[in-house]
Amino acid sequence: MADKIMAVTGHRPEKVGGYSDEASKRLTTFAEEMLKFYKPEAVITGMALGWDQAVAQACINLKIPFLAYCPCKEQDRKWFPESREMYRYLIPFAKEVFYAVPGTYPGAWCMQVRNEMMVDDSDYLAALYDGSPGGTANCVAYAQQMGKEIKQLWDPWQWFLANRC
């Protein structure tokens, strides 16, 4: 799978351990292990809280280029100050930053536009997805519709939590 572009989608902190520094470090460590295994040439991340940002941090740590595909310029407008600070720390490390829609937040639909851009511009999708409805499910469904290979990471994540933490 080396020399391919990986897009990532996954759950927010509520479903992957919470907002603590410890939870964030655990998720980033898992992201690093996943990146070492798949060895992508570059990664596309939607920069959402949780999995997306953990993957961005793991890319920085491993010196893997990543592309930030943001739904709009105010993606972080409703986040807690600590979350906004992390987002603003990560963005300058992106090789490129793309916005699904220009300007300010037009509504939740722009996140699906972003998801479709990520899937369209990647070779495969790595999904930290537990099967529940929501934005991650929508991204996975679009990737399936487009015939993209999907690496399902939920079971490896559960194993990691049980055996490595």
Regions found by a protein language model. Name each.
Residues 1-165:
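Acidic/glycine-enriched connector segments
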